[in-house]
Protein backbone atom coordinates (compact mmCIF):
# COMPACT_ATOMS: atom_id res chain seq x y z
CA UNK A 1 0.00 0.00 0.00
CA UNK A 2 1.42 3.39 -1.00
CA UNK A 3 2.27 6.08 1.54
CA UNK A 4 0.42 9.35 1.15
CA UNK A 5 2.91 12.23 1.39
CA UNK A 6 2.10 15.93 1.73
CA UNK A 7 4.93 18.14 0.43
CA UNK A 8 5.02 21.83 1.29
CA UNK A 9 6.76 24.16 -1.16
CA UNK A 10 6.30 21.85 -4.12
CA UNK A 11 6.91 24.61 -6.67
CA UNK A 12 10.21 25.66 -5.06
CA UNK A 13 13.67 24.17 -5.45
CA UNK A 14 13.58 21.84 -2.43
CA UNK A 15 9.93 20.83 -2.47
CA UNK A 16 9.95 20.41 -6.24
CA UNK A 17 12.87 18.01 -6.04
CA UNK A 18 11.08 15.99 -3.35
CA UNK A 19 7.82 15.84 -5.33
CA UNK A 20 9.52 14.73 -8.55
CA UNK A 21 11.61 12.05 -6.86
CA UNK A 22 8.75 10.57 -4.84
CA UNK A 23 6.58 10.38 -7.95
CA UNK A 24 9.14 8.06 -9.54
CA UNK A 25 8.36 5.52 -6.81
CA UNK A 26 5.01 3.72 -6.86
CA UNK A 27 5.12 3.31 -3.09
CA UNK A 28 4.29 7.01 -2.67
CA UNK A 29 1.22 9.10 -3.51
CA UNK A 30 2.11 12.80 -3.51
CA UNK A 31 0.06 15.87 -2.62
CA UNK A 32 1.52 19.36 -2.74
CA UNK A 33 0.12 22.78 -1.93
CA UNK A 34 0.12 26.05 -3.83
CA UNK A 35 -1.56 29.43 -3.63
CA UNK A 36 -1.99 29.16 -7.40
CA UNK A 37 -2.65 25.57 -8.55
CA UNK A 38 -3.06 26.79 -12.14
CA UNK A 39 0.51 28.11 -12.41
CA UNK A 40 2.77 26.55 -15.01
CA UNK A 41 4.90 24.88 -12.33
CA UNK A 42 1.80 23.31 -10.78
CA UNK A 43 0.59 22.11 -14.15
CA UNK A 44 3.94 20.38 -14.67
CA UNK A 45 3.64 18.64 -11.28
CA UNK A 46 0.10 17.53 -12.11
CA UNK A 47 1.33 15.99 -15.35
CA UNK A 48 3.87 13.99 -13.35
CA UNK A 49 1.08 12.65 -11.14
CA UNK A 50 0.94 14.96 -8.13
CA UNK A 51 -2.30 16.21 -6.62
CA UNK A 52 -2.03 20.00 -6.28
CA UNK A 53 -4.34 21.66 -3.75
CA UNK A 54 -4.93 25.37 -3.20
CA UNK A 55 -3.51 26.00 0.28
CA UNK A 56 -0.24 26.89 2.01
CA UNK A 57 1.26 27.07 5.49
CA UNK A 58 -0.14 30.58 6.05
CA UNK A 59 -3.72 29.24 6.06
CA UNK A 60 -5.63 28.65 9.33
CA UNK A 61 -5.08 25.34 11.11
CA UNK A 62 -8.49 24.09 10.05
CA UNK A 63 -7.68 24.49 6.35
CA UNK A 64 -4.34 22.72 6.66
CA UNK A 65 -5.99 19.96 8.68
CA UNK A 66 -8.49 19.30 5.87
CA UNK A 67 -5.63 18.73 3.43
CA UNK A 68 -3.46 16.73 5.82
CA UNK A 69 -6.10 14.25 7.00
CA UNK A 70 -5.19 10.76 5.84
CA UNK A 71 -1.55 11.62 5.08
CA UNK A 72 1.14 9.24 6.31
CA UNK A 73 4.11 11.56 5.82
CA UNK A 74 4.88 15.28 5.55
CA UNK A 75 7.85 17.14 4.09
CA UNK A 76 8.09 20.74 5.30
CA UNK A 77 10.41 23.45 4.03
CA UNK A 78 9.61 26.93 5.33
CA UNK A 79 10.22 30.26 3.64
CA UNK A 80 11.68 33.25 5.47
CA UNK A 81 11.31 35.63 2.55
CA UNK A 82 7.92 37.25 2.70
CA UNK A 83 7.08 35.61 6.04
CA UNK A 84 10.02 36.56 8.29
CA UNK A 85 8.70 36.54 11.89
CA UNK A 86 5.68 34.49 10.77
CA UNK A 87 7.93 31.61 9.65
CA UNK A 88 8.21 30.19 13.17
CA UNK A 89 4.46 30.47 13.74
CA UNK A 90 3.68 28.73 10.45
CA UNK A 91 6.22 25.96 10.95
CA UNK A 92 4.99 25.15 14.45
CA UNK A 93 1.38 25.22 13.24
CA UNK A 94 2.06 22.68 10.48
CA UNK A 95 3.85 20.34 12.90
CA UNK A 96 1.03 20.58 15.45
CA UNK A 97 -1.57 19.81 12.78
CA UNK A 98 0.51 16.85 11.57
CA UNK A 99 0.54 15.37 15.06
CA UNK A 100 -3.21 15.91 15.41
CA UNK A 101 -3.87 14.27 12.02
CA UNK A 102 -1.90 11.15 12.91
CA UNK A 103 1.00 11.72 10.51
CA UNK A 104 3.55 8.96 11.10
CA UNK A 105 6.72 10.54 9.68
CA UNK A 106 7.56 14.24 9.49
CA UNK A 107 10.68 15.51 7.69
CA UNK A 108 11.74 19.12 8.19
CA UNK A 109 14.38 21.00 6.22
CA UNK A 110 16.53 22.60 8.89
CA UNK A 111 19.86 24.48 9.06
CA UNK A 112 22.68 25.27 11.49
CA UNK A 113 21.54 28.13 13.76
CA UNK A 114 24.01 31.01 14.19
CA UNK A 115 22.43 32.43 17.34
CA UNK A 116 22.52 29.13 19.22
CA UNK A 117 25.89 27.87 17.95
CA UNK A 118 27.71 31.17 18.44
CA UNK A 119 26.08 31.98 21.79
CA UNK A 120 24.49 35.08 20.33
CA UNK A 121 27.52 36.48 18.49
CA UNK A 122 25.90 35.90 15.08
CA UNK A 123 22.23 36.03 14.15
CA UNK A 124 20.36 35.23 10.94
CA UNK A 125 16.55 35.15 10.95
CA UNK A 126 16.54 32.93 7.86
CA UNK A 127 18.55 30.29 9.73
CA UNK A 128 17.61 30.86 13.37
CA UNK A 129 13.86 30.66 12.66
CA UNK A 130 14.26 27.13 11.33
CA UNK A 131 16.15 26.02 14.44
CA UNK A 132 13.22 27.09 16.63
CA UNK A 133 10.84 25.10 14.44
CA UNK A 134 13.16 22.07 14.59
CA UNK A 135 13.28 22.22 18.40
CA UNK A 136 9.47 22.26 18.56
CA UNK A 137 9.20 19.26 16.23
CA UNK A 138 11.76 17.32 18.29
CA UNK A 139 9.79 18.02 21.45
CA UNK A 140 6.60 16.75 19.78
CA UNK A 141 8.36 13.49 18.89
CA UNK A 142 9.82 13.17 22.38
CA UNK A 143 6.37 13.54 23.94
CA UNK A 144 4.68 11.43 21.24
CA UNK A 145 7.03 8.59 20.15
CA UNK A 146 4.60 7.47 17.43
CA UNK A 147 5.26 10.83 15.69
CA UNK A 148 8.62 10.16 14.04
CA UNK A 149 10.57 13.20 12.89
CA UNK A 150 13.70 13.43 10.76
CA UNK A 151 15.67 16.40 9.49
CA UNK A 152 17.65 17.27 6.37
CA UNK A 153 20.08 20.13 5.82
CA UNK A 154 20.31 21.53 2.31
CA UNK A 155 23.61 23.05 1.13
CA UNK A 156 24.29 26.22 -0.83
CA UNK A 157 22.67 25.45 -4.17
CA UNK A 158 24.76 25.21 -7.34
CA UNK A 159 21.76 26.98 -8.89
CA UNK A 160 22.58 30.11 -6.88
CA UNK A 161 25.62 30.78 -9.06
CA UNK A 162 23.31 30.90 -12.06
CA UNK A 163 20.46 32.91 -10.57
CA UNK A 164 22.01 35.13 -7.90
CA UNK A 165 25.82 35.15 -7.70
CA UNK A 166 26.78 35.54 -11.33
CA UNK A 167 30.36 36.54 -12.21
CA UNK A 168 30.50 40.05 -13.68
CA UNK A 169 32.73 41.41 -16.43
CA UNK A 170 35.69 43.44 -15.09
CA UNK A 171 34.67 46.13 -17.58
CA UNK A 172 32.35 46.42 -20.56
CA UNK A 173 35.22 45.68 -22.96
CA UNK A 174 36.97 43.02 -20.86
CA UNK A 175 36.91 39.28 -21.42
CA UNK A 176 37.77 38.72 -17.74
CA UNK A 177 35.19 38.15 -15.01
CA UNK A 178 34.93 38.64 -11.24
CA UNK A 179 32.74 36.76 -8.78
CA UNK A 180 31.95 39.15 -5.92
CA UNK A 181 30.71 37.46 -2.78
CA UNK A 182 30.98 37.60 1.01
CA UNK A 183 32.39 34.12 1.63
CA UNK A 184 35.98 34.16 2.89
CA UNK A 185 38.18 32.78 0.07
CA UNK A 186 39.72 30.22 2.43
CA UNK A 187 36.43 28.94 3.87
CA UNK A 188 35.03 25.64 2.59
CA UNK A 189 31.24 25.33 2.46
CA UNK A 190 28.87 22.57 1.39
CA UNK A 191 27.30 22.82 -2.06
CA UNK A 192 25.01 20.68 -4.18
CA UNK A 193 22.54 20.38 -7.03
CA UNK A 194 19.32 20.92 -5.11
CA UNK A 195 17.41 18.96 -7.75
CA UNK A 196 18.97 15.84 -6.17
CA UNK A 197 17.74 16.50 -2.62
CA UNK A 198 14.65 14.39 -3.30
CA UNK A 199 16.82 11.27 -3.54
CA UNK A 200 17.82 11.68 0.09
CA UNK A 201 14.31 12.54 1.28
CA UNK A 202 12.88 9.46 -0.43
CA UNK A 203 15.47 7.26 1.31
CA UNK A 204 14.55 8.75 4.69
CA UNK A 205 10.82 8.25 4.11
CA UNK A 206 11.49 4.60 3.23
CA UNK A 207 13.41 4.05 6.49
CA UNK A 208 11.59 5.98 9.25
CA UNK A 209 12.97 3.97 12.17
CA UNK A 210 16.55 4.19 10.93
CA UNK A 211 16.34 7.98 10.56
CA UNK A 212 14.13 8.74 13.56
CA UNK A 213 15.50 11.89 15.20
CA UNK A 214 18.43 12.05 12.79
CA UNK A 215 19.72 15.14 11.01
CA UNK A 216 21.03 14.17 7.58
CA UNK A 217 23.10 16.65 5.55
CA UNK A 218 22.85 16.80 1.77
CA UNK A 219 26.19 17.85 0.31
CA UNK A 220 27.61 17.04 -3.11
CA UNK A 221 30.90 18.88 -2.70
CA UNK A 222 32.85 20.94 -0.21
CA UNK A 223 34.40 23.93 -1.97
CA UNK A 224 36.11 27.25 -1.32
CA UNK A 225 35.22 30.32 -3.42
CA UNK A 226 38.62 30.00 -5.10
CA UNK A 227 37.77 26.46 -6.20
CA UNK A 228 34.38 27.68 -7.44
CA UNK A 229 35.87 30.31 -9.76
CA UNK A 230 38.49 27.82 -10.96
CA UNK A 231 35.72 25.41 -11.97
CA UNK A 232 33.74 28.19 -13.68
CA UNK A 233 36.91 29.20 -15.55
CA UNK A 234 37.54 25.63 -16.64
CA UNK A 235 34.01 25.05 -17.92
CA UNK A 236 33.56 28.40 -19.67
CA UNK A 237 37.15 28.84 -20.85
CA UNK A 238 37.02 32.38 -19.41
CA UNK A 239 39.28 33.96 -16.83
CA UNK A 240 37.28 34.29 -13.60
CA UNK A 241 38.73 35.69 -10.37
CA UNK A 242 37.26 36.02 -6.90
CA UNK A 243 36.70 39.24 -4.98
CA UNK A 244 35.87 38.94 -1.30
CA UNK A 245 33.49 41.59 0.00
CA UNK A 246 33.25 42.02 3.75
CA UNK A 247 29.83 40.75 4.88
CA UNK A 248 28.92 44.13 6.39
CA UNK A 249 29.54 45.89 3.09
CA UNK A 250 27.92 43.06 1.13
CA UNK A 251 24.78 43.48 3.20
CA UNK A 252 24.60 47.17 2.33
CA UNK A 253 25.06 46.75 -1.42
CA UNK A 254 23.75 43.27 -2.22
CA UNK A 255 21.82 40.98 0.12
CA UNK A 256 21.53 41.56 3.87
CA UNK A 257 20.31 38.07 4.78
CA UNK A 258 23.07 36.35 2.78
CA UNK A 259 25.63 38.63 4.43
CA UNK A 260 24.40 37.59 7.90
CA UNK A 261 24.66 33.91 6.97
CA UNK A 262 28.15 34.26 5.54
CA UNK A 263 29.44 36.29 8.49
CA UNK A 264 28.57 33.24 10.59
CA UNK A 265 29.87 30.59 8.16
CA UNK A 266 33.12 32.50 7.62
CA UNK A 267 33.95 31.89 11.27
CA UNK A 268 32.27 28.53 11.90
CA UNK A 269 32.57 26.75 8.54
CA UNK A 270 30.06 24.44 6.86
CA UNK A 271 28.13 21.39 8.04
CA UNK A 272 30.99 20.23 10.29
CA UNK A 273 29.62 22.41 13.07
CA UNK A 274 26.33 20.52 12.99
CA UNK A 275 27.52 16.97 12.58
CA UNK A 276 25.65 14.38 10.57
CA UNK A 277 26.83 11.88 8.00
CA UNK A 278 27.44 13.35 4.54
CA UNK A 279 28.07 9.87 3.11
CA UNK A 280 24.40 8.83 3.40
CA UNK A 281 23.38 10.88 0.35
CA UNK A 282 26.48 9.80 -1.58
CA UNK A 283 25.69 6.14 -0.91
CA UNK A 284 22.25 6.47 -2.50
CA UNK A 285 23.58 7.75 -5.81
CA UNK A 286 26.66 9.40 -7.25
CA UNK A 287 25.90 13.07 -6.73
CA UNK A 288 26.53 15.69 -9.39
CA UNK A 289 29.67 17.78 -8.92
CA UNK A 290 29.76 21.52 -9.59
CA UNK A 291 31.73 20.97 -12.78
CA UNK A 292 29.27 18.31 -13.96
CA UNK A 293 26.35 20.59 -13.14
CA UNK A 294 27.73 23.50 -15.18
CA UNK A 295 28.38 21.22 -18.13
CA UNK A 296 24.92 19.67 -17.83
CA UNK A 297 23.20 23.05 -18.15
CA UNK A 298 25.66 24.22 -20.83
CA UNK A 299 26.73 27.15 -18.65
CA UNK A 300 28.33 30.09 -20.44
CA UNK A 301 29.61 33.56 -19.65
CA UNK A 302 28.70 36.12 -22.31
Curated annotation (Swiss-Prot):
Keyword NADP: yes
Alphabetically ordered keywords of this record: NADP
Pfam family, one: NmrA
Gene3D superfamilies on file: NAD(P)-binding Rossmann-like Domain, UDP-galactose 4-epimerase, domain 1
Coiled coil stretches, renumbered: none
Positions with a binding annotation for NADP(+): 9-14, 35-39, 56-57, 78-80, 130, 157-160
Alphabetized CDD domains for the sequence: NmrA_like_SDR_a (cd05251)
GO CC terms of this entry: nucleus
Domain of life per record: Eukaryota
PANTHER family: NITROGEN METABOLITE REPRESSION PROTEIN NMRA FAMILY MEMBER, NMRA LIKE REDOX SENSOR 1-RELATED
Function field: May be a redox sensor protein.
Family: Belongs to the NmrA-type oxidoreductase family.
Protein name, entry field: NmrA-like family domain-containing protein DDB_G0286605
Origin species: Dictyostelium discoideum (Social amoeba)
Origin organism lineage: Eukaryota, Amoebozoa, Evosea, Eumycetozoa, Dictyostelia
